Amino acid sequence: MALKTFKPYTKSTRGTILVDRNGLWKGKPFKSLVSPKNAMKGRNNNGHITSINRAGGHKKMYRHVDFYRKKFDMTAVVERIEYDPNRSCYIMLVKFDDNSHSYYLAPQKIKVGDKIINGSKKEIKIGNCMPLQDIPVGIDIHNVEIQPGGGGKIARSAGTSVTISGLDGNYSLIKLASGEVRKIDSRSLATIGVLSNPDQKNIKIGKAGRSRWLGRRPHTRGVVKNPVDHPHGGGEGKTAGGRHPVSPTGQSAKGLKTRDNKRTDKFIVR
């Protein structure tokens, strides 16, 4: 997919850059694989704001994407590639030999009519899913399970992938996009290929209204708030905040390591 630009007929089109979705399915989603989605709008079950700057947004139907890929040794044909408003990459509708359908994450270079399969010792082909122990070192993969049978958790957003950098006993060494190398059970499943829509990172929203369609509210700086609302608030006239940058709850915003899971530290190589 390519990017599309707009002539500056209005202020909102000046500088706007969006992804051209002409090649995607233009109809409705597959009815049995969607359900209504109740938007939380940044609130918890008490109605209190737990994630600031979120509200509204266009109503979305949730597409039930299969991250587990448990239908082994059964060929599936890609029927169509669709836009999914709930994630940044595209999804594909596949039809199995038993006439059942599933939604999968769509990798780059996959086309309508391509055949894919899940299972052990299958062909190294874009869209095929297999255990890590059957994938050669250096191959780009996505939708990687952390625990065998737990469903894909790693590399699920637009244009992302990870690579196998080596083996360590019963574990595969996976190099993440951040540069981190992590040990994952070699029986865990992964899918071959890089995920679709790599130009997602290059879009420019162009206007405030498009942010509201996405469910994003305006972001107010802490230094212009009152002391009751933010640690940087208050002061006579324009102030610098008086302390190192922090979040509204007082947590350091610059470089504080927030990971606190000693149980899984042993799986992080570097």
Residues of each region from the PLM?
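Structural recognition of beta-strand segments within beta-rich domains
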Residues: 86, 94-96
